[in-house]
Amino acid sequence: SFYNVATKEMEYSGVLSERYHDQSHGQSFFSVLMKQTNKNGLYFLDEPEAALSCQNQLALLYLIEECVKQNCQFIIATHSPILLGFPNAQILSFDEDRVEEVDYKSTSSYQTMKLFLDRYDYFVKDIQENNDGGVL
């Protein structure tokens, strides 16, 4: 878990560390990213949106862009339509038992979010009228 990562980072650093456990999950996650990214780095992120608000997902895009300028690369597993929207990203879809490169606007994450935003009033009405307390 990220809690364990933050704990180990404090143990390994040997210097007065950020007080990750005194911050929210998203704040501490973003702090670690900002502190630990270096030139020529290769970074693997697994669903970073789980820790980040929409605003911080946008901030992460800017951080990634700054890192890319320093020859860094990122491999990110995500369902976030925001993170998938990184300019010129190579997007690989693992849907339907095969791996294929896809265009941003053809991802299910983008299409689902666009449908929700375009038809928000419909979804609100449908939820209010048809939800019996179960999962949609």
Task: Name what the model sees in each region.
Residues 23-47, 55-67:
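GG-anchored amphipathic helix commonly corresponding to the ABC/SMC/Rad50 NBD signature/C-loop
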Residues 55-76, 80-136:
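C-terminal lobe/lid and adjacent interdomain/linker elements of RecA-like ASCE P-loop ATPase modules
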Residues 1-38:
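ABC-family P-loop ATPase nucleotide-binding domains
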Residues 14, 26, 41, 85, ...:
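Residue-identity detector for glycine
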Residues 16, 45, 76-79:
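Preference for short coil/turn "hinge" residues that link or interrupt alpha-helices
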